Amino acid sequence: MELLPLYVGKEGVVAIGEIGYDDQTEAEDKFYRLQLELAKEVDLPVLIHTPHRDKRKGTIRSMDVSEEHGLDPKMVIVDHNNEETVKEVLDRGYYAGFTIYPHTKRGSERMVEIVKQYGPERIIVNSAADWGISDPLAVPKTADLMRKSGIPEEHIKMVTYQNALTAFGQSGQMDEQDWLNAAPLDQTKKMSGNSVLRGGQTPRVEGSSDFVEN
């Protein structure tokens, strides 16, 4: 905990997290509360990890403690939701994240049904590569399935892009213009005589990055 304040102000830090409970121990509770206070102090969004076991109980506890420490629900993304937790998370004003894994947690088909039932507001579809079998294309594959299932394009964009941008953009460190109108790349330039290149690498010179919307 002593080191975290040294990093939260660095460029590109968009949230504190994932933080929260897994086994729901006293130690987890202690540090969860300390990290919530840090997030409040530096005015950053919070990304909450909900436990694998007793998920509903742990999710409710996570929100209760967050509110106890005075965090605004709109600044908090509660991740790894399922059918048991999503209604209460949304009803209480939080962002509800859903992690898509190929064979566990949340399949694309189930995600489609959740968006159909609850709509696109404050729902964030994401993927992960932290353990087990993962798929870096899980989000676009889920978007394609939503499209085939008749979900409006505007709703698909919200749950796979815009809601995450809105939530994490509250940090002041995330602006889509950074990639829509990215500066040209020129690795021949040096800063105070120093180059980013190492070991005889060939410098790259490119125009502005292209961002393609489907």
Give residue spans per PLM region.
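Active-site glycine- and acidic-residue-rich loops that bind
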Residues: F98-S108
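Short helix-capping segments at alpha-helix termini
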Residues: E68-D72, Y118-G119, K148-P152
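Short acidic/histidine-rich active-site segments
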Residues: Y118-P136, I156
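Short loop/helix-cap segments at secondary-structure boundaries that form the rim of catalytic
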Residues: V86-G93
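Mid-to-C-terminal alpha-helical segments outside catalytic/metal-binding sites
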Residues: P140, D144-N214
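Short acidic active-site motifs
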Residues: E84-T85, R110
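Conserved, mostly hydrophobic/aromatic
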Residues: E18, A39, A96, A128, ...
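Divalent metal-binding pocket/active-site signature
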Residues: E2-E84
